[in-house]
């Protein structure tokens, strides 16, 4: 970490903008002065080593120097520049390389002042199994299934699809039109009669020989052609086969094909793909309002509209102001004619295109609601090997698709703003109800603990985190509770609080003595919720007194009369009287939301642990000489299988009916 002089602060001073340039470490200014006039990517770091901003430049020296050659005042860019203490750069060969590297780094480093589209789950695919095997008859009859993950060459994958629902709709279509199987191979290989799907005309029952391998292969081929967009050809082939069977007076087979043709015709009509020339297209519509943005991605694959998916970027206001104030200057300086500054919509859309298609196949055509930089499309083509065209202001069917995407973007953004407004109101109500002194409601951090077990078995504690007006799933933690009397919730609460805050409390004490806070140190929450009444709060108070932490942070959620929802009361560790907020209180709604999430998280973890313990518990009875009675005595003596596993052979031999030799056998079996 760079050393700051005593006269400097990592934060910009409050108040009016100074007349002089903000001070920066000499090493930083020296690094800036020594930059080459070459294309590249730069990263700014603050005092704690966190990445502030990632940018690209045609001329690194000119671009980076512009940040430090003038006073930016109290703007967002000024606030960011005041925090910069270190710089890193990477020289590249071209602007296209700079674009790709910049957005790779943005996704990897999560800088505070860049437009950031956070990674979501990978896209789902429709999987069709392949690679016939003589040892597995099922592979001669491929199955269709939902799939998410790494692909294997021996199978075929169609997609990606925007959602799991879209894949399941496609699978249902494969069943209705082509009667393809969906059962797992072990089920397929061991069936002796058709399943219900055969009865309702959604499977041809290849498992029991109701269709030949050749006919099933024909259905598979038609399904593949349909998924690739050759719907018309599939329809013509089915009609030709139907007429051929009719001419041979094979009316039952002709009727089956007639039903397939009717089902396929209905699908094509519903999805409006009768005369669509586009095979694979992504439609991107952006809506910006209230400092937030939504990019709605609609996907057309094989000429079929598969649905859409909304994305909500972070840091829109900060990033666009910095781009407009500084990031775009270079484009003006390095061009003979000054182009107009891109709109916020264009900046958001370009950020999405650059980040989204790093890990997702890009189709040859993008239909966009705002213009996209040609250099960005060239960079995508270099990365993917596919020539990419962006169509702005489309016509005919493309225009219909774009209008649908724009409508959905507006609806999704309105929903988000409404939800955020409601959640912010709840946060404010909680802060006011508990007299929490906060300058920034966004910074309110609540951690909630819950204990879960079944009759003392598989005890786990959960900790969930609420911050920035929403639950922070990535910060959830589970704690396995050991070495306590089974069922002792108070001891479990004591253990989890010590483990959660013990090291942090020690670090804070050392920082008070040295006057320096180590980099990367976490912070105490503004509120610690425990699911329980006075007993749990008393235990939490003992732990905080032992650690020297502020007792006013602790609040217990005590169930009301009859344990009815809405009658909960808040119990305080610092001696304040209990508070009843009222069943319609926004503050209580937030407390209940956090408490219920902690309970859900604890329950799911406890059930998984209990299932594992019970499966492992079968090992005891597998040991020669251990029957139900001796197993029961062992579990009763040591509190569970884990306790038996942790015990030594000498301890195990103290159990009635367990000899020294058997104890050693048990010890070996469990280790």
UniProtKB/Swiss-Prot annotation:
Q: Which residues form the GIY-YIG domain?
A: 37-115
- Tell me how this protein assembles: Interacts with UvrB in an incision complex.
* GO terms of biological process kind: nucleotide-excision repair; SOS response
Q: Which GO terms describe its molecular function?
A: DNA binding; excinuclease ABC activity
Give residue ranges for domain UVR.
Answer: 232-267
Q: What is the lineage of its organism?
A: Bacteria, Pseudomonadati, Pseudomonadota, Betaproteobacteria, Burkholderiales
Q: Where is this region: Disordered?
A: 1-20
Query: Where is this protein localized, as stated in its record?
Result: Cytoplasm
Record field: compositional bias (Low complexity): 10-20
Q: Which family does it belong to?
A: Belongs to the UvrC family.
The coiled-coil regions, if any, are: none
Origin species: Albidiferax ferrireducens (strain ATCC BAA-621 / DSM 15236 / T118) (Rhodoferax ferrireducens)
Q: Which gene encodes it?
A: uvrC
Which protein, by its recorded name, is this?
A: UvrABC system protein C
Q: Which domain of life is it from?
A: Bacteria
Query: Which HAMAP family does the record cross-reference, listed alphabetically?
Result: UvrC
Instruction: Provide the function of this protein.
Output: The UvrABC repair system catalyzes the recognition and processing of DNA lesions. UvrC both incises the 5' and 3' sides of the lesion. The N-terminal half is responsible for the 3' incision and the C-terminal half is responsible for the 5' incision.
**Cross-referenced PANTHER family:** UVRABC SYSTEM PROTEIN C, UVRC/OXIDOREDUCTASE
Keywords, comma-separated and alphabetical: Cytoplasm, DNA damage, DNA excision, DNA repair, Excision nuclease, SOS response
GO cellular component entries: cytoplasm; excinuclease repair complex
- Name the InterPro entries on file: GIY-YIG_endonuc (IPR000305), GIY-YIG_endonuc_sf (IPR035901), GIY-YIG_UvrC_Cho (IPR047296), Hlx-hairpin-Hlx_DNA-bd_motif (IPR003583), RuvA_2-like (IPR010994), UVR_dom (IPR001943), UVR_dom_sf (IPR036876), UvrABC_protein_C (IPR050066)
Do you know which CDD domains this protein is assigned to?
GIY-YIG_UvrC_Cho
